[in-house]
Amino acid sequence: MFRPSIKFKQSTLSIIARRLKSSAQHQPLRSSFVPSPIVFVAGLAVAAVGGYYCLDSRSAIHEYVLCPLIRTFTDAESGHKLGIFFMKYGLSPRLLDDGKNDQSDVLGVQVFGHKLKNPIGLAAGLDKDGEAIESLFNCGFSYVEIGSITPEPQPGNPQPRFFRLPKDDAVINRYGFNSSGHFNVLATLKLRFNKLLNKFGTSHSSEQHPFSNAFQQGKLLGINLGKNKFGDEVNDYVKGVERLGPYADVLVINVSSPNTPGLRDLQSEAKLTNLLTTVVKERNVLGKNLLGNKPPVLVKVAPDLTEPEIESIANSAKEAKVDGIIISNTTIQRPVDRLLTTDKQLINQAGGLSGKPLKPLSLKALRTLRKYTKDSDLVLIGCGGISNGKDALEFGKAGATFIELYTAFAYKGPGLVGKIRDELAEELRKEGKTWEQIIGSDDK
């Protein structure tokens, strides 16, 4: 058998090596990639479009990807804190057409001496310490309410104290007025106020200056006041008016959280009249806030009230000369006939229920309250279970001058505000009316 010699093998290998070297000198290296200018520009364009898409709060990625991911990988309270963290540092999306296509021709509403762009507000409880005000306004809210804020810092109830009912788009919370206290929030508000005042400047004309603590045209900042667990049932609120009133467009007296022992007892007529009368007197002593406006006083009440109790609240509000009533807070009821959640241990957690199952209760309470206040100047604010434009319209027709969201916003993400705004405007245009024209129209 023929066996090639070692010399032959070496000769053959050297020839192959020379040919490969020659080929390499004339062929481009295919393993190296140098992007052409077109590819580079296209990449930048894709990144820019993607970034713009994610910055728009109404992008589907927020409702259908990011919010579900947060719910999957965090418990309810951790998810809450994460959301506030992102908003605090400006890492959250915004409603990009809030300035141009704001639907204010249909949705604008005159309230407390201001013209709101739309009747959509944020309820207290989300931003407890006023850390994310700008980002929340940038979502499209015309009214943002921070708090509840107590005089002294307190941790609230032990954890776990916040529970999701995802099948019902609902939550149960028993936070218990966890708050960093008046002075810590005051420091945050002062820093924000001075920063924005310097940025805005003092030389603007009245037409240009918003003259509200929102520092945005057609928007207002509300501050919700609570009492410490073992605090005085009157003086705790008076301190809040005195300390935080200068930075508020609206002051809210919260007597309806179910998670502070004895708090709801303040809704009885004698106690409530005394409390609200004292608070209004303190507001009058305070006079105007730092931007020259006297902040109106509202009281926030529960949905778990009988008709006589609602009537007595209306009487107290009129006698004390407060400016309005927010109805309602969370409910201690568990309407099992409307709940899809079947886990009894979860359903029976102590605390207040909010979200979609609350809507029938809060809407009924609003209609009842309207019955006893329509002969007055009291402004009613609807809150509880609102998650779309049709819900908002129902509350408006029942007597709400504007409405507030919280739980639906947490579930659906920042795009919900723009979605409700556009849905509500569409419903009103179908009827050929504006928001102001339909307020309380159910009782005509």
UniProtKB/Swiss-Prot annotation:
Keyword terms of this UniProt record: Flavoprotein, FMN, Membrane, Mitochondrion, Mitochondrion inner membrane, Oxidoreductase, Pyrimidine biosynthesis, Transit peptide, Transmembrane, Transmembrane helix
GO cellular component terms, semicolon-separated: mitochondrial inner membrane
GO MF assignments: dihydroorotate dehydrogenase (quinone) activity; dihydroorotate dehydrogenase activity
Note accompanying the cofactor annotation: Binds 1 FMN per subunit.
InterPro entries: Aldolase_TIM, DHO_dehydrogenase, Dihydroorotate_DH_2, Dihydroorotate_DH_cat, Dihydroorotate_DH_CS
Primary site of residence: mitochondrion
Cofactors (names): FMN
Membrane protein topology class: Single-pass membrane protein
Active site residues per record: S257
Subcellular localization, as worded in the UniProt entry: Mitochondrion inner membrane
Enzyme Commission number(s): 1.3.5.2
Transit peptide endpoints, chain numbering: 1-27
Pfam family, one: DHO_dh
Notes on activation and inhibition: Inhibited by the dianisidine derivative redoxal and by brequinar.
Chain positions recorded as substrate binding sites: K128, N173, R174, Y175, G176, F177, N254, V255, S256, S257, P258, N259, N329, T330
Segments crossing the lipid bilayer: 33-53
Top-level EC class as recorded in UniProt: oxidoreductase
Recorded catalytic activity of this chain's protein: (S)-dihydroorotate + a quinone = orotate + a quinol
BP term (GO), one: pyrimidine ribonucleotide biosynthetic process
Biological or metabolic pathway of the protein: Pyrimidine metabolism; UMP biosynthesis via de novo pathway; orotate from (S)-dihydroorotate (quinone route): step 1/1
Membrane recorded as keyword: yes
Function: In the de novo pyrimidine biosynthesis pathway, catalyzes the stereospecific oxidation of (S)-dihydroorotate to orotate with reduction of flavin and the transfer of electrons to ubiquinone, which is part of the respiratory chain. Does not use fumarate and NAD as electron acceptors.
PANTHER family, per database record: DIHYDROOROTATE DEHYDROGENASE (QUINONE), MITOCHONDRIAL, DIHYDROOROTATE DEHYDROGENASE (QUINONE), MITOCHONDRIAL-RELATED
Family affiliation: Belongs to the dihydroorotate dehydrogenase family. Type 2 subfamily.
Protein's recorded name: Dihydroorotate dehydrogenase (quinone), mitochondrial
Protein's organism: Candida albicans (strain SC5314 / ATCC MYA-2876) (Yeast)
